[in-house]
C-alpha cells in the first residue's frame, strides 16, 4: 500500500482562492485547512452559478477529488 503524501498547500493558507470543481462548478473563498487527501475547508465560500448569480455558502468542506483547478486570487511569493 502506498503512503499518501500531504499536498503542499501551506503557502495558500488564509489566502483567497478560486476553485473550479467537477460538474463545471466554481467556488471562491479563503483556505482555512486541508488534509492529506486535499479535502479543503473554505471560509466565506461563494459558489458562482451558470446564470450569473451566486450563493453564499459560508464555511464549507470541499472534497479533494472534486477539484479540477485551484488558483490564488493574488500572487503568492
UniProtKB/Swiss-Prot annotation:
Protein's GO biological process: mRNA splicing, via spliceosome
A Pfam short name: LSM
Principal subcellular localisation of the protein: cytoplasm
The UniProt record lists the keyword Oxidoreductase: no
SMART domains: Sm (SM00651)
Keyword Cytoplasm tagged: yes
GO cellular component, one term: P granule
Gene Ontology molecular-function annotations: RNA binding
Alphabetical keyword list: Cytoplasm, mRNA processing, mRNA splicing, Nucleus, Ribonucleoprotein, RNA-binding, Spliceosome
Domain Sm: 4-76
InterPro entries given in the database record: Lsm7/SmG-like, LSM_dom_sf, Sm, Sm_dom_euk/arc, Sm_G
Cell compartment(s), UniProt: Cytoplasm, Cytosol; Nucleus
Subunit annotation: Core component of the spliceosomal U1, U2, U4 and U5 small nuclear ribonucleoproteins (snRNPs), the building blocks of the spliceosome.
Biological role stated in the UniProt entry: Plays a role in pre-mRNA splicing as a core component of the spliceosomal U1, U2, U4 and U5 small nuclear ribonucleoproteins (snRNPs), the building blocks of the spliceosome.
Family: Belongs to the snRNP Sm proteins family.
Stated name of the protein: Probable small nuclear ribonucleoprotein G
Originating organism: Caenorhabditis elegans
